[in-house]
């Protein structure tokens, strides 16, 4: 099949003006939310400068932190006077409650609400609001002063505590409203040595968040290959006027859990202390995610397509029409692909059979988080459909649909991978998860028990995940401006029951499945996806 080298997958786009208006309205609504919280701040301290808590400037505390930082106490250790805590497992992290003098966090929040301009950051890894770098915000007097405190007081103090050479600091403000999140990453980039988060939540009754409100800093352990593993090992809830910092390394995996409260935004000042090139950076850049397992067609199984497929897709004229559409657009969606009774039987079995079917969580956590079926436990209609996708009959059909050499005398050694996935709240895949196509590939995506907003797949142009832009201050990859994001998106697949999506993607094309927010309605239960890839 011939495809355009400039457009591996041709997208169906919305009107840009319409998208822009909707985004502006949504952004205005959400950015305006913190302003209403100003009324609940109470009396705001009139101050011209940010002052560190004197308790953290005492030599005795510095010495205690130095000792605690180097000790290997997995359960952590706590200082009685300040409540400072240090944990070494799964990596070194320190919590300093009451970092600034009383009333300072209120004054900072008031200035943030009144003066900070927010930019919406939205990609596979994150959704939240971010300010400019504090060094570029001269109108924000207290924030500028906070940056100076980090530079002149906190940086040399951290050098003593951590025994690391720290040259400079970068910082910005982040705001997470309900539904926002930042998925698993390690912060490891070039010269980052120590990451920090200063929490701002001075609202009465919300000084320390509960687990039900979300927004926790969630810490992950990792395996022998430095891949983060489920479940979350430690949670640190937002707490007003608390300063957290940790050593950036090949195991410093963490995420910001989805904010689930509409009452308050999660506000922080966050960034990094930088030094020499991080020693762990080179090794991390060579770490590869696991790849899909490709198998040859199942020669023992050749099910009659007429028992399963909608009869319209067996007609020669329909096949030729599909082939022409795929040749022109590199994709097509075939509605009501299977006979309705087969689809209903399969969906019912997936929802009801909790004893026989065995599922396992698919990791590592910095690549993906969803469940996959142990195919050896498949029975009944589910087994029949899975066998069909790997059968010679399906390879023959896909040859007719696409003109690819997946069957016949010109076929050399065609292969496929078949996976049955289960998607619920909190599930995702991210860019760079091993699903970048290293050669031309035909993807099939089939939904059962579909729900709007769950298991939505986005295809991006080659190299779209690595634009030449500045690094974000609360994530691992580069920022995207609106134009770059829009132009890089080739196709978005939205869930539709009993619809087979066929996508031909060229070498270098990548994809991700958007994080399933807790706000996504899943009243009918989880969404199931049969995901297949075929190679000539």
From Swiss-Prot:
* UniProt KW keywords: Cytoplasm, Dioxygenase, Iron, Metal-binding, Nucleus, Oxidoreductase, Vitamin C
Q: Please verify whether the record's keywords include Cell inner membrane.
A: no
Q: Which Pfam families match?
A: 2OG-FeII_Oxy_4 (PF13661), Ofd1_CTDD (PF10637)
Q: What's a BP term from Gene Ontology annotated to this protein?
A: regulation of translational termination
Q: Which GO terms describe its cellular component?
A: cytoplasm; nucleus
Q: In which tissues is it expressed?
A: In third-instar larval tissues,highly expressed in the fat body, with significant expression in other organs including the brain, salivary glands, imaginal disks and gut.
- Asked whether the UniProt record includes Metal-binding among its keywords, one would answer yes
At which positions is 2-oxoglutarate bound? 199, 266
Q: What Enzyme Commission number(s) does the record list for this chain? A: 1.14.11.-
Catalytic activity annotation:
[ribosomal protein uS12]-L-proline + 2-oxoglutarate + O2 = [ribosomal protein uS12]-(3S)-3-hydroxy-L-proline + succinate + CO2
Region described as Disordered: 1-35, 467-486
A GO molecular function term, named singly, is: peptidyl-proline dioxygenase activity
Q: Which cofactor does it need?
A: Fe(2+); L-ascorbate
The cofactor binding remark recorded in the entry reads: Binds 1 Fe(2+) ion per subunit.
SMART domains per the UniProt record, alphabetical: P4Hc
Q: Which residues form the Fe2OG dioxygenase domain?
A: 165-275
Basic and acidic residues: which segments have biased composition?
14-24
List positions binding Fe cation: 185, 187, 254
Q: Which domain of life is it from?
A: Eukaryota
Task: Give the subcellular location.
Answer: Nucleus; Cytoplasm
Instruction: Tell me which PANTHER family the record gives.
Output: HISTONE ACETYLTRANSFERASE COMPLEX, PROLYL 3-HYDROXYLASE OGFOD1
Protein role: Prolyl 3-hydroxylase that catalyzes 3-hydroxylation of 'Pro-62' of small ribosomal subunit uS12 (RpS23), thereby regulating protein translation termination efficiency.
Assembly and binders? Monomer.
Concerning its family, UniProt says: Belongs to the TPA1 family.
- Full protein name: Prolyl 3-hydroxylase sudestada1
| Source species | Drosophila melanogaster (Fruit fly)
Q: What's the gene? A: sud1
